[in-house]
Amino acid sequence: MEIIEIDGSMGEGGGQILRYSLGFSAVTLKPVRIYNIRAKRSNPGLRPQHLTAVKALQMITDAVVKGAKVGSMEIYFEPKRRKPGNYRFNIGTAGSTTLVIQAILPALLFSKGYSSVEIIGGTDVPWSPPIDYMRYVFIYNLRFFGVDVEIELYRRGHYPRGGGRVVLKVKPLLGKMKPINIVERGKLISIYGISHAVRLPRHVAERQARSAATVIREKLGVEPNILIESYPPGRDPHLGPGSGIVLYADVEAGTRLGGDALGARGKRAEIVGREAAEKLIDELSSGMAFDSHMGDMLIPYMFLAGGESIAGVSKLTNHTLTAIEVSKIFLPNSKVSIVGNKGEKGIIRIHGVGLSP
């Protein structure tokens, strides 16, 4: 069988190439060799959360794997079959649970049965989507493909202690994924959010929310509905400490766009709230139906769906363009066209391969 070769330093050269390559290998059951893994990063090679994604997909597909250790620059992955089931994976650090979800979800969707996956690690950590973005924006938008997924949050995990606990519940696809055709967002309908603070005073979450709401009212003329999540001392189940806020907008096209920010030591809660609001406003300003982060997460699903998908994204990022390049290597029979320049809003048109479970 032909082995697909992926240069891990292509495009943005980060862990995303590894996640998408392994994800496509697991879905298509094509073996892959990935080299120069995270070559452009200051600490190249596999990190613990990447290793968790490798081991998770190894278990889900009974794969033969070589090179799966922290620091490894090369990995060989040969999947045998896709198995639904109940799984549990512990990253063992504050490594991102949401990036592991990104890697394993396509394989589980194309398995012939229901799956439940418990993942222990970081839920709200730098350089990855926060868990509330995944719960309220990512899986919400995946509905358009006919995908039925839930993410349950039982405990938050922040850097450096981690310890978060999430459960991914996946109903298998009954047939080919539906293509999507959603370009412009249309009118803004409403804005929601969740502002959390764990192992910290309640006023941290309240100040984040208040600051975000002030910016949204001033710039958009909308009153957002932001939930406050905090816990009384002595009854806080989290390791913490940590805080963050995720905002999301419902729009006329039926999609959701998000904006988020994380708290950090020495960073005022008001700044956290303002950052999230300004990010959301920036995403909405393009007039497109999907935000820049959703843009790159849509790509594998557009390639795997049956027929032509068209999506309007607020920004054509490096991540999105790299996701397209990796997808084309695994699915050469697909057709892609992009209107727009890198760093600007764009329209992505992909004629998917219509993979069946």
Swiss-Prot record:
InterPro entries: RNA3'-term_phos_cycl_insert, RNA3'_phos_cyclase_dom, RNA3'_phos_cyclase_dom_sf, RNA3'_term_phos_cyc, RNA3'_term_phos_cyc_type_1, RNA3'_term_phos_cycl-like_CS, RNA3'P_cycl/enolpyr_Trfase_a/b, RPTC_insert. One of its GO terms (molecular function) is ATP binding. Disulfide bonds: none annotated. The active site is at residue 319. One of its GO terms (cellular component) is cytoplasm. Keywords: ATP-binding, Cytoplasm, Ligase, Nucleotide-binding. Catalyzes the conversion of 3'-phosphate to a 2',3'-cyclic phosphodiester at the end of RNA. The mechanism of action of the enzyme occurs in 3 steps: (A) adenylation of the enzyme by ATP; (B) transfer of adenylate to an RNA-N3'P to produce RNA-N3'PP5'A; (C) and attack of the adjacent 2'-hydroxyl on the 3'-phosphorus in the diester linkage to produce the cyclic end product. The biological role of this enzyme is unknown but it is likely to function in some aspects of cellular RNA processing. This is RNA 3'-terminal phosphate cyclase. The gene is rtcA.
